[in-house]
Amino acid sequence: SRNDTIESITIPYPLIIRPINSTKGEKEDIHICHTPGELRQSLNEQSHCENFILQEFVEKEYELDCIGVMTDQGMILPGAVLKHRHWPPLIGAGAYGLFTPVDDQNINFQGLETFLKQSGYHGPFSVEFLHKGDKNYFMEVNFRNEGLAYAATVAGANLHARYVDPSVKIDKVKPTYMMNYSLDFLYVKNGDLPLRTWLRDFLRTRCCINFSLRDPKPLAAHYYHKLFRRK
């Protein structure tokens, strides 16, 4: 908690601090701290979050966001988003990545299913890992619908339909690039990514997290309210 003494912490620096309960914190509550002074500064920042988890910071090669659903018939885990870019960088939401079949990612499938069965949870979920070398380092399980779950649908695995209708078949999924363009374009705006590189990635994207050509009205309504109904 904020009142604990940082001198008693035995985790080696650098470390990462994040809300222990994601529903009671924000992305802004996640910090990478290299010294006790930076940790104290992070804990002193104004926030609604009071309790945090501290972990050794792993210099990851990339993050994996495994997307699945737990049903009466067992766990269905078709694939994972290999995140190439986040916003804010390193610690933020997935902005651009590749949804790949789970068989390609060396995930402990049986261990994960056992964990979910023991938890008693049924419904959509996601599991996040850090990847470095030949290892996947467990981060967290989210017992909720994942923001990137639409990538699984576009790749051929409609998990929500399968959850409500066991007769829905999920065949082998295909690798699919996904992008949250409104976040990812900030890399270009900030000068961290050339426009030509971003356009290349955008053109090979088949899953825009916040836009669908088959259903454009939600996006149009979003920008209409943003532009013309400001208070």
Regions found by a protein language model. Give the residues of each.
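A short glycine-rich, hydrophobically flanked beta-strand micro-motif that places a catalytic Asp/Glu
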Residues: 122-133
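Active-site nucleotide/adenylate-binding loops and adjacent lid/helix of ATP-dependent enzymes
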Residues: 1-53, 58-59, 70-74, 105-109
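ATP-dependent carboxylate/phosphate-activation module, predominantly the ATP-grasp catalytic core
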Residues: 37, 56-120, 142-167
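Short secondary-structure junctions
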Residues: 49-50, 118-122
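Protein kinase-like catalytic core scaffold
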Residues: 15, 76, 137-140
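Peripheral (often C-terminal) accessory segments that flank ATP-dependent C-N-forming ligase machineries
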Residues: 165-231
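Active-site proximal loops enriched in glycine and acidic residues that flank catalytic Cys/His/Asp
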Residues: 129, 140-143
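A short, glycine/Asx- and small/polar-enriched loop/turn
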Residues: 9-12, 132-137
